[in-house]
Swiss-Prot record:
GO terms for molecular function: ATP binding; serine-tRNA ligase activity. The keyword Cell inner membrane does not apply. This is Serine--tRNA ligase. Keywords: Aminoacyl-tRNA synthetase, ATP-binding, Cytoplasm, Ligase, Nucleotide-binding, Protein biosynthesis.
């Protein structure tokens, strides 16, 4: 959430910065201006009324000594003035509540280093690791590879849960567990503390990281009141862990990694990635979260990006990094890198991680701070990134590591987690006859 005082003091500056995101961001900010002006008027009026109250109280004390007959009339005037103060305070409270509601719908202005653009086609590739492998055959997409091996099952998953769900069997299920353990081991070795968070959170927690109120249609929630929400990413509970806390500067940065299932309604994704496991309602991810000093957050952002890329480098998976343009950034982010892994069976680079610096946008909502050099509490900067998506790592392995005979070579770092298994070969599983 934006700082109301800063917005009110220089509305045009925020308007210009948000215009880089598109007209929608400017429109979201527009209603704030007249309400902020009314808030200023009410604060001035309230200050005037309270001074009049103080003067009236002083006059009553003076009359009690000099003219007791006039005291009752003065008290009646004071009561009327008190009613006016209450009326002004009530309107001010309503205005401030509406301003807070409106600011919850305004996205984070982009950092100056973010390129202007409308959508993903305007993103800028900033680095590449590895090369596209040359195959002596036409590589298949992961859904064909997984189906031929018998380790990815969609028909039974649809019977259980509907579309956008998958059952992993045999070596694929083992591969998923291996990837999670490998990712956590790498990140903890690089200074992250492992967290296993709750998967159901409150509406306040979802609001803290920016999913609510704007993106409720993308979330799954329970039917009880008040509802609980299934997390779309471990960023939500982990970032909120330190809500209403103040850190000493010496404790910063605070670095966490967390494995969790993620649940997303995928509203607006009809017709996209309907085959395979790229876009699921339920998937696993290892998330990286940092709380940083404001002046160090962009250095920490680059470190987090490197940490996310490190797991892919160790697995030998060719990938590239793109700096997202203003039109493709997430709501809470000031700057985002996407890590895109090469999928030869699809002939495309596909996102496997987003690494974002949200500056103080989330911290203002959750009120997480640290003591600056002068000892005064200052809002922390929050950073998050996938380290990385587990299902999409399986996609990359099935496509990049496939062989002409249909088997898939398991990257060496994962083999100790899979009992030394070196490749995935076709498996047969028990199955009855549909009736």
């Amino acid at each position: 959430m934006l700082d109301l005082k800063a917005v009110a003091a220089d509305f045009e500056s925020f308007e210009r910065r948000l215009a880089r995101r598109g007209e929608g961001a400017v429109q979201a900010l527009a209603p704030v201006k007249p309400l902020a002006a009314r808030r200023r008027e009410l604060n001035v009026l309230l200050e005037k009324q309270k001074k009049e109250q103080a003067d009236a109280n002083a006059r009553i004390r003076e009359l009690a000594r000099t003219d007791k007959g006039a005291v009752e009339g003065a008290r009646a005037s004071l009561r009327a003035l008190g009613d006016e103060v209450k009326k002004t305070e009530a309107e001010l409270g309503e205005v401030e509540a509406e301003l807070t509601r409106l600011l919850m719908l305004v996205p984070n202005p982009p950092h100056d280093s973010v390129p202007d653009g409308k959508d993903e086609h305007d993103n800028v590739v900033v680095k590449t690791w590895g090369e596209q492998k040359a195959y002596g055959f036409t590589p298949k997409p992961h859904w064909e590879v997984g189906e031929a091996l018998g380790v990815l099952e969609w028909q039974q998953a649809a019977k259980l849960s509907g579309s956008r769900f998958t059952i992993l069997k045999g070596a694929a299920a083992r591969l998923e567990r291996a990837i999670v353990s490998f990712f956590i081991d790498v990140h903890t070795s690089r200074g992250y503390t492992e967290i296993l968070p709750p998967y159901l959170v409150t509406g306040e927690t979802m609001t803290g990281t920016g999913q609510l109120p704007k993106f409720e249609e993308d979330l799954f929630k329970t039917t009880n009141e008040p509802p609980m929400y299934l997390i779309p990413t471990a960023e939500v509970p982990v970032t909120n862990m330190h809500r209403d806390e103040i850190f000493e500067a010496s404790a910063m940065p605070v670095s966490y990694c967390a494995f969790s299932p993620c649940f997303r309604a995928e509203a607006g994704s009809a017709g996209r990635d309907t085959r395979g496991i790229m876009r699921q309602h339920q998937f696993h991810k290892v998330e990286l979260v940092k709380l940083s000093k404001a002046e160090e957050s962009y250095a920490e952002h680059e470190k987090m990006l490197d940490d996310a890329c490190e797991v892919l480098r160790r697995l030998g998976l060719h990938h590239r990094v793109s700096l997202l343009c203003t039109g493709d950034m997430g709501f809470s982010s000031a700057k985002t890198y996407d890590i895109e892994v090469w999928c030869p069976g699809q002939g495309a680079y596909r996102e496997i991680s987003s690494v974002s610096n949200c500056e103080d946008f989330q911290a203002r909502r959750i009120r997480v701070r640290y003591r600056g050099e002068n000892g005064k509490p200052r809002l922390a900067h929050t950073l998050n990134g996938s380290g990385v998506a587990v299902g999409r790592t399986i996609v990359a392995i099935l496509e990049q590591c496939q062989e002409a005979d249909g088997t898939v070579v398991i990257p060496e770092p994962l083999r100790p987690y899979m009992g030394g298994l070196e490749r995935i070969a076709a498996e047969t599983f028990p199955r009855g006859v549909e009736r």
